Amino acid sequence: NDARRQRQMCIRDSSYAETGHLCLCTLHAGGTKQALERIQSFFPEEQVRRLWMDLSINLRAIVAQQLLPRRDGDGRTVVVELMLSTLLMQEHIRAGDVDKVTELIKRSSKYGMQTFDQALIAAFKQGLITPEQALRAAESENDVRLAIKLDSPLRGADGRSSLDVETPEGRFVDKWWLDR
């Protein structure tokens, strides 16, 4: 029922946008890539090429958000993925290259865009969330883990990260390897 309502809303908003109206639409999606895939799923295969063309012309932004518990236990903090419609983004959307969108967002921070992983790293560096929260919410756990480990305030004088644990043999390893 909810999916049908979202489909109807998406089709209606697409028609409104073609006439120059500002349309805001909410979707249950985990990020930009998933939102675009979900929008595509609302349309029959024979309309997908036109959909990508319409989106490349009319779509201005996709904002995705997650609420995570704050490190200090005082409520939640928001992390936001933001995709803006640049010429290159329009080209990728027009071509239906949804798989390239996240990488393009990642490389477009100078335009104000950011991925969830970039937002998680920023929230961690600001002390808003713990490393574990950042890793649990990450799209690419490895990328976020690396950014956390390279963050100098996390490293002690011995060079170890807060994510390192001592093994029974007396070695220090990343907790991630032990969890596998």
Residues covered by each model-derived region:
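Small-residue (primarily alanine) positions within well-ordered alpha-helices
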Residues: 7, 16-17, 35, 134
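Conserved ATPase "switch" residues in P-loop NTPase domains
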Residues: 17-18, 124
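Short beta->alpha connector loops at strand-helix junctions that form conserved
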Residues: 27-28
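Alpha-helical scaffold elements adjacent to nucleotide-binding pockets in ATP/GTP-utilizing enzyme cores
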Residues: 12-15, 35-39, 119
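Conserved P-loop NTPase
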Residues: 57-180
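Loop/turn-to-beta-strand initiation segments
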Residues: 19-24
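Single conserved hydrophobic/aromatic residue that forms the stacking wall/gate
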Residues: 1-11
